[in-house]
Every structure is written in structure tokens, then in C-alpha cells.
Regions:
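Transmembrane helix boundary and interhelical loop/hinge segments in multi-pass membrane proteins
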Residues: 110-116, 245-252
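Hydrophobic alpha-helical segments of secondary membrane carriers
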Residues: 100, 129-135, 268-272
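Hydrophobic alpha-helical membrane segments of integral membrane proteins
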Residues: 114, 128-131, 240-241
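Alpha-helical architecture
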Residues: 105-106, 133, 244-247
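Extended non-transmembrane interhelical loops and adjacent amphipathic helices
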Residues: 94-121
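Predominantly cytoplasmic-facing regulatory/coupling regions of multi-pass membrane proteins
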Residues: 1-98, 144-240, 247, 252-300
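Hydrophobic alpha-helical segments and helix pairs
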Residues: 119-152, 159
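Residues at alpha-helix boundaries and short interhelical turns
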Residues: 106-110, 241-242, 259
Length: 300
């Protein structure tokens, strides 16, 4: 078989990326920027945030923070299963996961992937992991499970069919994980179910927000779940674009106009943004501090 020869510019790019991954300054700089950026967004939106009716929004805000942490914790578990297929290196995987959560907020989702690769290369050079492949698998399964959730709201039959299709795809993607202690099929079913729970959590948060601004029979959990799954899956699909973060906002706005008054759509989008930014900042910081304490206690 004839080998495909890559162009010189692509070889140079790959070489520079590898050098970048191994540079501790790059991962540190990216971590700092990932914290500054969401804080800046919150600061720029401070006038709108202060105008929120916190007397009624506070309860939903606090409940959403708790639900969000459950979802974040489950996604952290799934990440460890995807990259290792087991929990023997769960703490180191968790450290990388929470350290790079905020990088998803940076324009162009590729920074999240680059940050992960760089941290694994710098902090855990002796632990062999297929980070790039795992990033892709995580991204693809998240989109597929989001579509599974959406199809369930249209028809249970479509939901079941798409569920087994997603399990089959996930099993195929994980089949070469020779170090896995769990059979690929069992691992795939676990991952898909855990991600569906995460999608349900997002739908619940949106449902609380919608019922807070529009107490009508039109707003149901099923509708909220469908809107959340479809809008978020679309934004994940287009995450690589600089305006990827805004795609979910536009998708949410388009899908919510039939459920609530147009004047309240922007309010819900702002509330979603505030909850997610605050939750990412708070829970990632708290989790990293806990992991540091755990690491210190485990050190002889």
C-alpha cells in the first residue's frame, strides 16, 4: 500500500503543536486566560445581572448550581472511562478535567482540546493516554446522546432506536482500548446512560427558568428538555467556530419563541449564561482544591 505523504506545512504544524503541548508555560497561560475570560464576561454583563429579580431567581440559581455539579461530576467520571476505561488514574484525570472546564468558554472550542493535551503532556508524561482520540470520542458521544434525548421527546421508538445506535457507535469507538477492565459494550452503555442523565439535568435547569418567567401549560419538562438537547447539540457540533458560544444562545432563542413571550427570551438566555459561568468557576475551583488536598494526604 502506498503511504500518503503529508505536505510540508502540515508536518511543520504538527511539529510545532507537539512542542507547544510540552511547554508548561502554554498550559499555565491557557489556564489563566480561561479564568480571566469568563470573569470578564460576568463583569461586562454586571448591569444586566444586577437588574435580574434576584428575590425570585435566587432559589432557581442555587438549585441549578447543585444540579450542574451533579452533571459536571458525571461528565468527569465519563471522561475517565473514555480515556482509561477504568478508575485507576481517576484523580489525575479529574485534575485535568476540572482544570480545563473553563477552556470550553474560550472562543473556538479547540482551546479546550489543546489545553487537555498540553496538561497531560506536561504533568503526566509517563502515563500513556490517547488524549486526542478521547477528546473526539467525548465530543461525538455528547452530540449523539443529545440527539437521543431530543428524539425521545418526538417518539419513544425513535429514542430507543437512536439509543442503541449510539451504544453501537460508542462500543465501536472503544473497542481498541486494550487496557480496559470493562467490556466495551458494558462500558458504552454506562457512558451513554450517564450522558443522558447530564442532558436531563440541563433540561431541568431550563425548565425551572422557563416556568419562573412563564407559568403557563405550554411550558413542560418534555418541551424544555427537547429545546435544551437540540440547541446544545447544535452548538457542540459547531464548537470550533469563534462564535460557537453564541450559537447555543441563538438556537435557544429560536426554539423558545413558541413557548414564552419574546421579551422574556433574552432574560432566560442571560440567566442560563450566568448560571453556567458561575457554576463552572465555582465548582471547578472547589474541585481542584479538593483534589489538591487529596493529593497531599496521599503523599507519604
Amino acid at each position: 500500500m502506498t503511504k500518503v505523504k503529508l505536505p510540508k506545512w502540515s508536518l511543520n504544524l504538527i511539529k510545532k503543536l507537539k512542542q507547544l503541548y510540552g511547554n508548561p508555560r502554554f498550559s499555565k497561560a491557557l489556564s489563566i486566560i480561561s479564568v480571566i475570560y469568563p470573569l470578564t464576561l460576568l463583569y461586562l454583563s454586571r448591569k444586566e445581572i444586577l437588574k435580574l429579580e434576584w428575590s425570585s431567581f435566587l432559589r432557581v440559581f442555587l438549585l441549578s448550581l447543585l444540579i450542574y455539579y451533579i452533571s459536571m461530576s458525571l461528565q468527569n467520571i465519563v471522561w475517565s472511562l473514555i480515556i482509561d476505561g477504568k478508575f485507576t488514574r481517576f484523580l489525575s484525570n479529574s485534575q485535568v478535567y476540572f482544570q480545563t472546564v473553563l477552556m470550553k468558554k474560550l472562543p473556538g472550542g479547540v482551546w479546550h482540546w489543546l489545553g487537555r493535551s498540553s496538561i497531560y503532556e506536561v504533568d503526566f508524561p509517563d502515563e500513556n493516554r490517547a488524549v486526542s482520540k478521547s477528546n473526539f470520542i467525548e465530543w461525538l458521544i455528547l452530540i449523539l446522546t443529545g440527539l437521543v434525548g431530543y428524539l425521545f421527546t418526538i417518539s419513544p421508538y425513535l429514542g430507543v432506536i437512536s439509543f442503541f445506535f449510539t451504544v453501537a457507535i460508542t462500543t465501536w469507538l472503544l473497542r481498541r482500548n486494550e487496557e480496559s477492565l470493562i467490556k466495551p459494550l458494558r462500558l458504552a452503555v454506562s457512558i451513554v446512560i450517564l450522558y443522558l442523565i447530564c442532558w436531563l439535568a440541563g433540561g431541568q435547569i431550563l425548565y425551572w427558568l422557563l416556568t419562573e418567567v412563564q407559568t403557563t401549560a405550554l411550558v413542560t419538562f418534555k418541551t424544555s428538555f427537547a429545546i435544551w438537547c437540540l440547541s446544545s447539540a447544535i452548538s457542540m457540533l459547531l464548537f470550533i467556530f469563534p462564535s460557537g458560544a453564541l450559537i447555543r444562545d441563538f438556537s435557544l432563542a429560536a426554539l423558545m419563541t413558541n413557548q414564552i413571550e419574546l421579551s422574556k427570551v433574552s432574560l432566560v438566555i442571560l440567566q442560563v449564561r450566568v448560571i453556567f459561568l458561575a457554576a463552572d468557576l465555582f465548582w471547578s475551583f472547589l474541585s481542584l482544591q479538593f483534589l489538591k488536598l487529596k493529593k497531599v494526604r496521599n503523599t507519604p
